Amino acid sequence: MQYSFTEKKRIRKSFAKRSIVHQVPFLLATQLESFSTFLQADVPTAQRKSEGLQAAFTSVFPIVSHNGFARLEFVSYALSSPAFNIKECQQRGLTYCSALRAKVRLVLLDKESPSKPVVKEVKEQEVYMGEIPLMTPTGSFVINGTERVIVSQLHRSPGVFFEHDKGKTHSSGKLLFSARIIPYRGSWLDFEFDPKDVLYFRVDRRRKMPVTILLKAIGLTPEQILANFFVFDNFTLMDEGAQMEFVPERLRGEVARFDITDREGKVIVQKDKRINAKHIRDLEAAKTKYISVPEDYLLGRVLAKNVVDGDTGEVIANANDEITEGVLEKLREAKIKEIQTLYTNDLDQGPYISSTLRVDETVDKTAARIAIYRMMRPGEPPTEEAVEALFNRLFYSEDAYDLSKVGRMKFNRRVGRDEITGPMTLQDDDILATIKILVELRNGKGEVDDIDHLGNRRVRCVGELAENQFRAGLVRVERAVKERLGQAESENLMPHDLINSKPISSAIREFFGSSQLSQFMDQTNPLSEITHKRRVSALGPGGLTRERAGFEVRDVHPTHYGRVCPIETPEGPNIGLINSLALYAHLNEYGFLETPYRKVVDSKVTDQIDYLSAIEEGRYMIAQANAAIGDDGALVDELVSSREAGETMMVTPDRIQYMDVAPSQIVSVAASLIPFLEHDDANRALMGSNMQRQAVPCLRPEKPVVGTGIERTVAVDSGTTVQALRGGVVDYVDAGRIVIRVNDDEAVAGEVGVDIYNLIKYTRSNQNTNINQRPIVKMGDKVSRGDVLADGASTDLGELALGQNMLIAFMPWNGYNFEDSILISERVVADDRYTSIHIEELNVVARDTKLGPEEITRDISNLAEVQLGRLDESGIVYIGAEVEAGDVLVGKVTPKGETQLTPEEKLLRAIFGEKASDVKDTSLRVPSGMSGTVIDVQVFTREGIQRDKRAQQIIDDELKRYRLDLNDQLRIVEGDAFQRLARMLVGKVANGGPKKLAKGTKIDQAYLEDLDHYHWFDIRLADDEAAVQLEAIKNSIEEKRHQFDLAFEEKRKKLTQGDELPPGVLKMVKVYLAVKRRLQPGDKMAGRHGNKGVVSKIVPVEDMPYMADGRPADVVLNPLGVPSRMNVGQVLEVHLGWAAKGLGWRIGEMLARQTKIEELRVFLTKIYNESGRAEDLESFSDDEILELAKNLREGVPFATPVFDGATEEEMSKMLDLAFPDDIAEQLDMNPSKNQVRLYDGRTGEPFERRVTVGYMHYLKLHHLVDDKMHARSTGPYSLVTQQPLGGKAQFGGQRFGEMEVWALEAYGASYVLQEMLTVKSDDVTGRTKVYENLVKGDHVIDAGMPESFNVLVKEIRSLGIDIDLDRN
């Protein structure tokens, strides 16, 4: 087995029983693939498929003018490279985007040409079409300097759907069937039955009309309509009664209304008897062709065709007329012999279309189309052209109606056609097929669709959403272009005069900036980033709304298996509407979710992997991943647990067609990170998944000792770590950069054989947490492609590490851990285990005001020396300054207008001169409740304004850093070149050279070492070929130098050009504060099993319960938090964590004893290879084994994969290995070694019973008490009621509500109550009076009228009630 550089350092022991058949796919693939398909940037123009931008362009172009003599054609498009890179965009608040240019061709036709059109002139030109935001390599977008994610949308697939109302519409509970044709864009077409069984249609949920109007409008006559939906009975009229053609199927189950006889007149069925199968056999045996029926059998039947008098041509009766005695008489008079009637019955052949025709009052096609026009455009006069145009535009025009590939495929599948392609508009037979199926459903044949089935819901990804917006922008452009194309010839316009890119830019900007699906990226930790990008939402434009979504949509559906996670979804109003993709899920070309399965052939499981969509999966029998398999791959058990069409059952192995890929297939990334998930209740697992996303990165991340084995995948795929792009040797490492000399076989000829990785240092994330990368390689290390070189936030040796491993004791402790409170040892705080760094960004802008420009300066009057001491000469705080609430960070003064001066001010001005009063101090100060260290300052200056010294210094530092990078590259490139040169020159014969090298001398190493490197090029070689090579190497080095100089110039130009700032802003300064947050009471913490709580007390180490060897517990949790919540996984995690740490202590003790390597190998083999997945320790050298052992001292990391984890036997084996009997005896453990005798830290007495003790990975969540704590003395008031505002953000007060008032009333504390309701709240005059009294030393309250009472009076008056206060 191949181990990567970081895996070798610390192997996670896996308890998985199954081998890895299929690797977890790249977790951000959905986003990245979707967007690259949209752009097709790297695809040559000729090979671009019709999707994304290409599809949008080809669907709108060519644009033809109204007169038809000018048209604008689309040729191709190209994307330029972005002006700024991602980091620069984030710093400057710009969008990371690329300019889109389209090559278009203007074709003008000759108006004079008599017959066919002749091209008069062609103009081709590249036109700017706006900016398209680009996706970063990690699947996010940088919009206006902040990272955003476009969430995928789960919406109803285009196609046709059949459903019924479940009997809710009509009081009788009758099922009313309906069908709906949903296009990708265009009008919806609904068909529905009413309680009287008449079939109606409606367009876009407008007024309903009988469906036959639509059928007539598409050109069918009533006769054709009936022929499409009914079978006919044939009658031959006799003088008395009639002969009916005998069709056996139609009689079965009917009650005979007369005696049925055979040819000889023998009675086969008596009157009023039900006709059964025997009667039909007898009739068939008698070779009955016709049955004689009495006259009244015909009455009430419905004619299928118009009946015309052969002689006169007069219509005697119309199709769909009921036969009455009068009609029969007319038929006989006209000597009509043959008639056809509709065959209907009550069971499976209802007269629905016939009854609908009776309701329909339109006569022909024109009348029907006019009726539809009136419904769509009420009040407009229907002219013939308008009527035709509207009807064709509804379903037949490609501009207005598009079923899309998916819609056509789904439609054809549903109506039972074989081909899955076809026209993208509706056809007449599509409408007929839909109505036929709907009538069949009403007749009791067939099934309605399940709209929550994932075969009927598809995912719209970034690419598709962006394409829709882009198309919308293009359509707006098309309208404008059409107007102007007419003047193109007369005014000699070029393509760029016709196209205005504003509508496109604004559509794209609006989508990326403010669409419901474009969200501010959750960047608390790497897991929250990945989960956000894998989120699937049913909300958003064209989706559901929270209020309207019922229970069914939110529920877990059998088709979610392996596609959407059944666990991870938010609590609250969005539950079930926002989901997460399952671990292996993948989108197919139509946007349906697929999941992988292993093929099973003849009861043998193969390694062939097939991705199946929800529709395909329904056809197969699929075994679960935990089915027992023999060595030859055969299914062993007699009965295997399996699923078919959503039902779970036990079947024999020969019926199995597929098998799950992995047990973790059904859950999402976050849920698959929970060890022992299978032992947790679903609700708690949901909380666990959601809370892992809120874990704050700790200062020193620590890998979980009990994981699930997916931690490395998550850390690497999230992009928070730094991975080697190419293999090589580490040439240089410091805290900020890693330089790697690339292996020769991976370096491309003529290119720099060096990779430089600049690490991200102390950068602010979207949630103000700290992103910081730390190198984990040393100089000289050999790394391969894909190896982790540096850890990011919340990663430890390339594994996700969200929290810390805490020694946990489950026991009550003096009520301090009552109701989920958490008791924590002071040592945890002292060791900075849960200390996190948060970075706050504070901005100040200097604007140009009416009274003159604001100025950023150090020169501020009446500012204390202490405050000024922190500012440099430009008035900006130094980096490294420690600041507290109220301290000045950036000095700024604003000019203020002349005011009427008081005598005191006049005196001051006379003494101190003018300066003091014409400006006011508007400096940037640290907000209340915040303190920290300044770690970075950025200054942005508008073009054309003099930079201050600080801004210049920042630019110089940046250039210096860049020059360092270039010098490094050059040093390695030259080193590499000179090594190659030396190998080439040694042993060659020279014709002369520096230091008087004689002709014919062989060059040796000593001679070269004696020469300066650059003089090697002056050696004249005898061998011409070698001389040419020497020249080539010299040229390539000079070329590289030239390239580097150009790159440096480019960078300098970028840095020294003015910054784009909002209008009116001259200068902007951003100050970054690093705030250190230690753990304190009130902080929220949680495990991974939904076991959350709040820190109630931090206890001195000496008071914590401790073990016999003096080790105190870190955390004490209440055992009552486990049984009722049914998240037993936490207890199992604690047991396994206890074993993991115990093994680590044993390895540490062996290393301390300096045990032989062989003994270490044996012990490690016992741990890794006795159970679960075996590891290949043989391939490790002794040094590697030693390094591995050193890294395991803090605990052997375990992986217990979801649904395939450690068993109780394996856990007890590990506990036995970790705690031999002598240690167990010393700690007074129970026989199963998972409980320990603890002693009370305060008294030293042992507790009565042993306590469950072990290690749990515990997280500190983002809900920190520092962010919630808030106090106010005076502050802002509400405008109308004059009461203090509420909430921390508004610096508001605490609400003294209704119940609090009752409490004071109950105590009779009338004075306290009075001041609460008046001067402390909204008595405006009273408030100022109190201040006045206090200043005078007179402690009296004059309570007046609360302002809210005046508001109430005004409100009563607004109701027209005259109310006045009698102020006596």
Swiss-Prot record:
Give the CC-aspect GO terms: DNA-directed RNA polymerase complex
Q: Name one GO biological process term.
A: DNA-templated transcription
Does the record bear Metal-binding in its keywords?
A: no
* Record EC number: 2.7.7.6
Keyword tags:
DNA-directed RNA polymerase, Nucleotidyltransferase, Transcription, Transferase
GO MF terms held by the record: DNA binding; DNA-directed RNA polymerase activity; ribonucleoside binding
Question: What is this enzyme's catalytic activity, as reactions?
Answer: RNA(n) + a ribonucleoside 5'-triphosphate = RNA(n+1) + diphosphate
> What InterPro entries does UniProt report for this protein, alphabetically?
DNA-dir_RNA_pol_bsu_ext_1_sf, DNA-dir_RNA_pol_bsu_external_1, DNA-dir_RNA_pol_su2, DNA-dir_RNAP_su2_dom, DNA-dir_RNAP_su2_hyb_sf, RNA_pol_bsu_bac, RNA_pol_bsu_CS, RNA_pol_bsu_protrusion
State if Metal-binding is listed as a keyword.
no
Question: Domain of life here?
Answer: Bacteria
Where does the chain cross the membrane? none
A UniProt-annotated Pfam family: RNA_pol_Rpb2_3
Instruction: Please describe what this protein does.
Output: DNA-dependent RNA polymerase catalyzes the transcription of DNA into RNA using the four ribonucleoside triphosphates as substrates.
- Which PANTHER family did the record assign? DNA-DIRECTED RNA POLYMERASE I SUBUNIT 2
What's the family? Belongs to the RNA polymerase beta chain family.
Subunit details: The RNAP catalytic core consists of 2 alpha, 1 beta, 1 beta' and 1 omega subunit. When a sigma factor is associated with the core the holoenzyme is formed, which can initiate transcription.
Q: What is this protein called?
A: DNA-directed RNA polymerase subunit beta
